[in-house]
Amino acid sequence: MNLPKQSGTGMMQSVVSIYPVAVLIWGKYSNREMNIRRFFLLLCNLVGYALGLPAQQTAVNPLIYADVPDMSMVRVDDTYYMSSTTMHMVPGVPIMKSKDLVNWELVSYAYDRLTDDVPAMNLDDGQNTYGRGSWASCIRYHKGMYYVSTFAQTTGKTYFFMTRDIEKGPWKRVEFAPSCHDHTFFFDEDGRNYLIYGNGKLFIAELEADLSGLKTGTERVLLENASAPAGGDIMLGAEGSQLFKVDGRYYLFNITWPRNGMRTVVVHRA
């Protein structure tokens, strides 16, 4: 992957040529629980397609009787692993596994405590960070290592957690500023690593080889308005990035929310 170059107007071009290939709408926007369930099924189907799974599965909704927002998934051999959001609660970023995308078991957490340096995380002096903490994780597997990343507005940082045994640990932790909102990270075939993040306007940057931070000078605007395929009146900009590469093409999935409309999944391809 080559990062887009800056144009003379100060705007950035997209990676190769990136354009919307799908706009998927689900659920009644006032029913958050149903939206989560349907998005979970949609993501399962998309990941299954990308990995060459049979198109049909038998399942009964809801798959999980719990709040499982912002899910990210990866398949390793015959096992699927999924991470989710825990916000202010600890331990954080639950890791679940399944053999069939239907029956899920909680097997681990990426971290025990996010930080001890922020008084609000410890409820000191009547402070709290309710609903904040860590959001929208991303889970990946690369060369024998499991990677889980997340970010926190509470601390202003991005976090990577790494382990060779996702169920038993131990986990190695790397953190850096800034807090890269709703990011997805990607190990490309050329050995370079990337982070895509943002809300509405999406950015891409190359990561240091050891994931210790963003490489200086590599941040570019990937999509000026990733919500555009869903219309012009948007109340929630495109976020929740998840990037996959299938048959030489990159597919970027985002969720957006048109005003007076339904939550919408937008897919761009490069």
Task: Kindly label every feature range from the protein language model.
Residues 1, 11-12:
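Methionine residue identity
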Residues 6-7, 13-14, 29:
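Cationic, low-complexity basic patches in intrinsically disordered or flexible, solvent-exposed regions
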Residues 23-57:
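Bacterial Sec-dependent N-terminal signal peptides
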Residues 55-270:
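Carbohydrate-active catalytic/glycan-binding domains of CAZyme proteins
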